C-alpha cells in the first residue's frame, strides 16, 4: 500500500507524463483560453490570468483555522522541523500568511520581494496591496517533505468585527485566491474549544466551489475522553452542516497532530488510523498533480465561457447614444433574469454561473460601453479545447498514474509512521540512511544510563538476546508518544536492520525516547556518537 515510500530515482524529478500533461495544459491555456479571458476582461471580475509558475509549481496544501487550533504545530509535526520565523502558543501567534517552501538554506523572504519572483506562483497577489504583502512571507528550509509539496500557513481566524476590520486587507478574498490554486485545504478545529466564529464562517464561504479539496481535522482530540470526543464530533458535524453549502459530508480526521505524549491515550488506535488516512491523502498529491491542474483548468474554462456570454449580452443591450447610465442600472438589477435567460439559451448548468450578488457589485464599477460583443471564433476555440483537446490528454494522465509509483511525499512524519513494528501492513523494510562513517573510538553517550535500560530490556524477556518488534512496540507505545515519532526512533535504533533490538539498540531507543520526552528533536540521521560500539564496524561495512 505504501509502495511510493520506497526510494528510487532522482528525488524531486517529475515523471515524463506529468511534464507532458503540464506543458500541454500551458499551451492550451495560452492559445485557447487566455485570448477569451483578455477579450472579456475576466481578470477584472474573477481571478487574474495564470502564469507558467501556476502550472509548474509543486502541489500546495493550505492550512486554515481559528487561532490556537494548532496550525503551525501541525505543519511542524509534518516536517519534524521548526519553521523559520514561526511562533507557537495559546494566543494568536501567526499573524501573516506564510508559504513554507523548500530551500537550500533556512531563511525568510518578505512578501514584496516574493511577488516579483517569476519562479514563485505568487505574482498575482500584488493587487491585494501593501498591507497584505507586509503580512505575507515565505519560509524556506531544507526539508525532504518540502521537496514534494509546499504548505501555506494562515493567520489565526479571530472572532468579532473589530479584529476583522483591523486586518487592513480582504482576508476572505486572499483565502479564495489560494483556494483556487492549492491542491488540498485542511481546516483545523480544536476539540477542546469547538466554535465557528463569524469570520471563520465567512472564510469557509470563500472556499465555496472547492469543497472537493477540503479536509477537516479535529485536532487536540487527546485532550478529551472517548465519550466527550463523540459529543464533540457530533457538534462539529452539525456546525459544519450550517456553514458548508453542500449536501455531501466533509471528511473529518480525528487526532492529535504534534510530537508530544498523548494526554488521554484511550483513543490511540483511532488516532493512528486517522493519521494514516490523512497522510495517504497528502502523500498522493504529487501523483495526482497533473489531474488536479487539468480539473482546475476545465473549471476555469467553464466559468470563462459563462462570463463571455454575460458580458456580450450586457454589451448588446446597451443603447448606442442616450440613457446609458440608466440602462446600466436596469441591467444590473435584472442580472438574475439575465442569468436564467443565458442558461436556457446556451444550455449551461446553473453551477457554472458566478455568484449573482457579487457580480452585481463588480459590474457597478465598470463602463458597459467598453465591453465587447460576442466573438464566435474565440468561443469555438474554447469549446474545441473542452470537447477534444482535453479528452486527448486523458491517456497521458493514465500513463502518469502508472509511471508515478515512486513519486510521493517522503520524509518527516510521513516516514516515521511506517517504520519497523509501526508498519500497519507488511514486514519491515530496510532503508538506506546514508550516514557518514563513525569513529570506532568515540565514546558512546548512552553508556552512562545503559544499566538502567538493561534492566527494562531483560524484564521484557528477550529471545536469544534480542527483542522482537511486537515486544518492543508494546513498551514503546507506553511512552504515549505518537506512532510517527516512535517509528522514527525505531528506524534510528535498529542499526543492523534485522527488525529486532539487542540490548545496545534498545538502550539507544530508550535514550532517544527520553530525549524526545524532554522536548529535544530527533536527528535526521544517527550521529556517530550515538551508534552502538558493536555496530560501528558493521555499519561502516554496510555503507
UniProtKB/Swiss-Prot annotation:
For the modification Phosphoserine, which residues carry it?
3, 438, 468, 470, 484, 493
Q: CDD domains of this UniProt entry?
A: EH, EHD
| Sequence ranges assigned to domain EF-hand in this UniProt record | 481-516
Q: Name one GO cellular component term.
A: endocytic vesicle
Q: What is the effect of changing residue 120 to N?
A: Complete loss of localization to CAV1 positive caveolae
> Any idea where the Dynamin-type G domain is?
55-286
Organism domain of life: Eukaryota
Coiled coil spans: none
Q: Which family does it belong to?
A: Belongs to the TRAFAC class dynamin-like GTPase superfamily. Dynamin/Fzo/YdjA family. EHD subfamily.
Q: What does this protein do?
A: ATP- and membrane-binding protein that controls membrane reorganization/tubulation upon ATP hydrolysis. Plays a role in membrane trafficking between the plasma membrane and endosomes. Important for the internalization of GLUT4. Required for fusion of myoblasts to skeletal muscle myotubes. Required for normal translocation of FER1L5 to the plasma membrane. Regulates the equilibrium between cell surface-associated and cell surface-dissociated caveolae by constraining caveolae at the cell membrane.
- Entry protein name: EH domain-containing protein 2
Organism, scientific name:
Homo sapiens
